[in-house]
A protein has these predicted regions:
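Ribonuclease/tRNase effector modules and their secretory precursors
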Residues: 1-97
Length: 97
């Protein structure tokens, strides 16, 4: 996977507002927390964006990114209850079967 880049101002804002940083997400990805890579659902408005689905401490975050030639530029971090149910709870249900 290509290296990650991001806006330091956005990272500070995310840390203050949401309690999670791009560093935390990249560490989780390195530790095997990358669950999926999705196409952005609004391709008309965001034609070059895709979304990393990342598990961090038992919760799933959606991380939109733009792929450049040499790196992935991370845009923001969105906590997702729906993705947590779909990705983590599904795994628990599969383990019980």
């Amino acid at each position: 996977m290509k290296p990650f880049h991001w806006s330091s101002e956005k990272n500070e804002s995310l840390s203050a507002d949401r309690g999670i940083s791009f560093e935390t997400v990249t560490v989780a990805i390195g530790a095997g927390g990358l669950l999926d890579i999705l196409a952005h659902p609004n391709q008309r408005q965001y034609p070059r964006q895709r979304i990393l689905v990342v598990a961090v401490d038992g919760y799933v975050y959606l991380v939109p990114f733009v792929e450049e030639d040499d790196y992935l530029f991370l845009k923001t971090i969105i906590p997702s209850r729906k993705a947590t149910r779909e990705y983590l709870r599904r795994g628990e249900a599969d383990a019980e079967d």
